[in-house]
Design a protein with these regions (language model features):
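Flexible, compositionally biased loop and terminal segments
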Residues: 1-254
Length: 254
């Protein structure tokens, strides 16, 4: 992995702002496979192989947080063979990649419900999270068995169990009960395969995010495409509800 963030090839005074937090809806694995006459699980395997170079691209660009939408609470409706295959693939990826990501300073976090997943997969996820918890180079959140509405409902349940009074509840308190507690909200949400919807992904956290869509299927999405999305993000103006525009993100690349 590169050790210094890029500056998108421009002089210092023109450098594009870099998003702190990029979230990606990794869509199109099945369609990528079908277009090649392959089984859907072959597309999911190709998609997982694409995660590593995108992580490297985030490090090279100086992005601090990457959140990957890997398996939604709605994906349980898919055929059992596909769901079980996804569990197997995730377990293999954890086994193959965790140690190297740890050596490179990447922190792994899981967002979503661990309960309901196979016990062996739960154990692997917990191991990866605990091993890498002190790393600071890049935080990678894997949203697996995750749904935005489910997250909000679960947060409300936890607040009720904790006995919070109505006057104690504000946005900051509510956010502290979400899976993303302690993390800044996504600045940029990327979706592959040409779709233009959130699909129940980070629906609280995405309130002021910028969106970027590409017709490329996830296995086709590369570092150059990530850089293109970040460059376009840097040229946008964000107002966060006010009249004052902020160009791109909230910080410039070093």
């Amino acid at each position: 992995m590169a050790t210094q963030p890029q500056t998108l090839g421009r002089p210092a005074e023109q450098r594009a702002p870099i998003p702190h937090h990029v979230a990606i809806i990794m869509d199109g694995n099945g369609r990528w496979a079908s277009a090649r006459g392959l089984e859907r699980l072959a597309g999911h395997r190709a998609g997982t192989e694409n995660i590593r170079p995108i992580i490297e691209g985030c490090v090279e660009l100086g992005i601090e947080i990457l959140t990957l939408y890997a398996f939604s609470t709605e994906n349980w409706r898919r055929p059992a063979t596909e769901v079980n295959g996804l569990f197997e693939i995730l377990g293999e990826v954890i086994d193959q990649e965790t140690q190297d990501l740890h050596r490179n300073g990447v922190r792994l976090r899981h967002i979503g419900r661990l309960e309901g997943l196979p016990q062996t997969l739960q154990d692997r996820v917990r191991y990866a999270v605990e091993l890498t918890q002190l790393n600071t180079r890049l935080t990678v959140n894997v949203a697996f068995n995750y749904g935005g509405r489910d997250e909000i409902v679960e947060a409300a349940r936890r607040m009720l169990r904790d006995g919070l009074r109505p006057e104690e509840l504000d946005e900051a308190t509510f956010s502290s009960y979400l899976y993303t507690e302690g993390m800044r909200d996504p600045d940029l949400i990327i979706r592959t395969a040409g779709e233009m919807r959130l699909s129940n992904f980070l629906i609280w956290q995405a309130a002021y995010a910028e969106y970027w869509s590409t017709p490329l299927y996830w296995p086709e999405f590369g570092k150059a495409d990530l850089e293109r999305a970040v460059r376009e993000f840097g040229g946008r103006e964000r107002r966060f509800g006010s009249l004052t525009a902020v160009r791109g993100g909230l910080r410039d690349a070093d």
